[in-house]
Curated annotation (Swiss-Prot):
Taxonomic lineage from the root: Eukaryota, Viridiplantae, Streptophyta, Embryophyta, Tracheophyta
GO-annotated cellular components: extracellular region
Protein name: Insecticidal protein LA-b
Reactions the enzyme catalyzes: Random endo-hydrolysis of N-acetyl-beta-D-glucosaminide (1->4)-beta-linkages in chitin and chitodextrins; Endohydrolysis of beta-(1->4)-linkages between D-glucosamine residues in a partly acetylated chitosan
Modification comment: Glycosylated; contains galactose.
Physiological role: Has insecticidal activity when consumed by D.melanogaster larvae. Has low chitinase and chitosanase activity.
Keyword Hydrolase appears in the UniProt entry: yes
GO biological process: chitin catabolic process; defense response to insect; polysaccharide catabolic process
Domain Chitin-binding type-1 span(s) in chain numbering: 3-13
EC annotation from Swiss-Prot or TrEMBL: 3.2.1.132, 3.2.1.14
Length: 13
């Protein structure tokens, strides 16, 4: 996710 710099399971950059 964007909260995690885009490298989490959310996948959003």
């Amino acid at each position: 996710s964007e909260q995690q710099x885009g490298r989490d399971v959310g996948g959003a950059l």
